[in-house]
Amino acid sequence: MGHSAEMIQKAIAQENGKVHVNAQSIPEKYQQKRADEAGVIEHIRYPSKDYFLAGKEITKEANVYLPYGYSRDKKYNVLYLMHGIGGDEAEWGMVDEDSLVKRMMDNLIYYKEIEPFIVVTPNGRSTENCAREGSDYNSFY
C-alpha cells in the first residue's frame, strides 16, 4: 500500500515535534543522577546497508546503555528502543550521562527493582539520508 507524499510529510512534521515528558509522573528517586554505581552511554557506529539504493554499504549510529559493572563475559537481556519516522538514534534522549533514560536505568538497577540489562537506541532508517531535506520519504516504507 502506497503512502501519499502529503501523508508522509505530515507524519514527519508530527514526529519532529518536541516530546514532553511529565517528569512528575516519574518518582524522584529514579530521576537522580547517581555518583556511584552508574552505567555508561556509548555512542557506536556500525556497518549497514541502504535498502533503497540496492544495498549500498553505509554506516549507521546507535547509543548503547551499559549497566554499572558491565562485563563482556556475562550475558544480558537487551532492550531495543526504536524511533519513529523522521527520528534517529538520539530520539529517546539517551545521548549522554545526563539522560533521563540513563538515570532511570541506573536507579532501577541500584534499588534492585530490575536486573541489569543493556539498552540500545539504533538508527533504524532504511536509507543513508532518509530524514534529510530533499530525500525520498517513500523509501522509509
Task: Label the model's feature ranges.
Residues 1-141:
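Non-catalytic cap/lid and distal C-terminal segments of serine-dependent acyl enzymes
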